[in-house]
Regions:
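Gly/Ser-rich "nucleophile elbow"/oxyanion-hole loop immediately N-terminal to the catalytic nucleophile
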Residues: 41-48, 92-100, 106-128
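Catalytic histidine neighborhood in serine/cysteine hydrolases
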Residues: 246-261
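Accessory cap/linker subdomain of secreted extracellular hydrolases
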Residues: 125-127, 135-218, 287-291
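Glycine/threonine-rich phosphate-binding loop and adjacent beta-strand/alpha-helix elements that clamp
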Residues: 18-24, 28, 34, 272, ...
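Short beta-strand/loop motif that positions the catalytic acidic residue
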Residues: 219, 225-227
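Proline/glycine-enriched tight loop/beta-turn segments at coil->beta junctions
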Residues: 31-33, 41-51, 218-220
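Short alpha-helix in the alpha/beta-hydrolase fold that links the catalytic acid
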Residues: 221, 232-244
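Short substrate-entry loop that stabilizes the transition state in hydrolases
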Residues: 44-49, 54-90, 232-235
Length: 461
């Protein structure tokens, strides 16, 4: 179904008359960025064409967004480019660092200087790494006229190291999506600490220089945030926090796509593309249009959104899970609830509260919350972890889990895994890796309480 949607979008782009030109843009340090410029064949209006720049994700290339460029090119000139260190571009990848921000400014200025382009009507669309670049460049003063971001971060540190424990598996995957020879020394300098949750002050400083949240309250530019329902790298909380801060026209779409365990494009790609084109048409051309402030796509996607005037209302479901377990090394505790009496859908960050007696250098507690339905496979609802380095003795731990929207069928039993890594739940669950701890490390876990924020009315079936 997704493939059919992409074919339809590409066909729509081919049916519209535009030209396509391959380019090489020279940066001020001598590095060349490979780019493609799509332009309508029609003559520009007196003030010039409004235009859009597309930014791809980490480890990607500009061709990943060909389907989107063609969908937009019937209405706008569209510039796609290989980010520094990616695809056919030169240079090294510093993951939206200062050098990449200089590149973004140069790309904007290059496009704005073209006689057929209206420099006051240039928009930006970015996914993941590209979304981070769009938001960071926006708060650094690049005068985008309208912005769209997809499955990205507003605060990179809180995304990758919530509660001072890095999502080591996600960090490993991201860093290995780019050949080591193409990583900038600034990334290599924090790589080992980012994997091991050590020297977190340096990791935070590095991440803060690539984040936008602290400055979003001054942004009045129209911003449309598209975030995935089940994205364990950059969760709904990243967009939710940014959405609340923005002062200009803003919209939030929580869709059926994302980083693992989801994919992009997802089954609602036609909806995402249609709304994206409508947003740019509204704020770059001025065509009147209305948008729901907040939209939530059901999973599986059935072609219809649930819309809200504000962020959806939720209530709390609290579940007590008794038991006591003593763990060493790769041991795990497993607690199971009774069956749920109704279908529920999470929306927000669940919490796990548990008493822990720590000794011998036990440095982390990871919680994986799953649902075991009456029929079908076990489903990971959410997961998270807390850094316990330096703690000894008895402590009441509160573990915040990832903010995702997950449908839990009626009759499901909740299963809570507590361990030192997410692999204790499944060998395929690589979000928190099983990193070494001292042989003397021990933890004794007491009863646990799970607090689930759930929608007052589920949107999925």
């Amino acid at each position: 179904m997704v493939f059919a949607c992409l074919l339809a979008l590409a066909a729509a782009g081919r049916a519209s008359a535009y030209t396509q030109q391959e380019l090489s843009l020279r940066m001020d340090d001598g590095v060349d960025l490979a780019a493609t410029l799509y332009e309508p064949s029609t003559a520009p209006p007196p003030a010039g064409h409004p235009a859009i720049v597309l930014f791809h994700g980490l480890g990607g290339k500009r061709q990943d967004l060909d389907f989107l460029a063609r969908a937009f090119a019937g209405s706008f000139p569209v510039l796609t480019l290989d980010a520094r260190g990616h695809g056919q571009s030169g240079g090294l990848v510093s993951i939206d660092g200062p050098r990449e921000m200089t590149d973004v400014k140069a790309v904007f200025n290059w496009l704005a200087a073209r006689p057929e382009i209206n420099r006051n009507r240039i928009g930006a669309w970015g996914i993941s790494l590209g979304g981070g670049a769009v938001l960071r460049s926006l708060v650094e003063g690049v005068p985008w006229a309208a912005v769209e971001t997809v499955e990205t971060w507003t605060d990179l540190y809180s995304a990758l190291a919530p509660q001072r424990l890095t999502k080591s598996g996600a960090v490993f995957q991201f860093l290995n999506s780019v050949p080591q020879a193409r990583l900038d020394p600034s990334v290599l300098a924090i790589r080992d600490d980012a994997l091991a949750s050590t020297n977190l002050g340096a990791v935070r400083a590095w991440a803060d220089a690539r984040s936008s949240r602290s400055q979003l309250a001054k942004v009045t530019t129209p911003v449309f945030m598209f975030q995935g329902r089940r994205d364990f790298a950059f969760d709904i909380a990243q967009a939710r926090a940014g959405y609340r801060l923005l002062k200009g026209p803003k919209r939030l779409y929580v869709g059926d796509f994302g980083h693992a365990p989801s994919t992009f494009p997802g089954p609602d790609i036609a909806q995402v593309t249609s709304l994206g084109l409508k947003w740019f048409t509204r704020y770059l051309i001025g065509t009147p249009a209305s948008f729901a402030p907040v939209s939530l796509a059901p999973s599986p996607w059935r072609g219809k959104l649930r819309t809200y005037a504000t962020l959806p209302a939720t209530r709390r479901l609290t579940i007590q899970l008794g038991g006591t377990d003593s763990l060493t090394g790769a041991g795990r505790a497993l607690r199971t609830s009774g069956p749920l009496t109704a279908r529920v859908e999470t929306f927000g960050s669940p919490q796990v509260q548990v008493t822990a007696q720590l000794s011998g250098g036990w440095s982390r507690v990871v919680a994986v919350l799953t649902a075991k339905p009456q029929r079908g496979a076990e489903l990971v609802i959410s997961e998270g972890g807390v850094n316990t380095t330096g703690l000894t003795g008895k402590h009441q731990l509160t573990i915040g889990l990832i903010d995702v929207a997950t449908l839990i069928p009626r009759g499901s039993r909740l299963q809570l895994y507590l361990a030192s890594s997410s692999l204790a739940q499944s060998s395929g669950n690589l979000l928190y890796l099983n990193l070494p701890m001292p042989p003397s490390a021990r933890v004794r876990l007491g009863p646990a309480r799970v607090v689930l924020p759930i929608l007052r009315s589920p949107v999925s079936r």
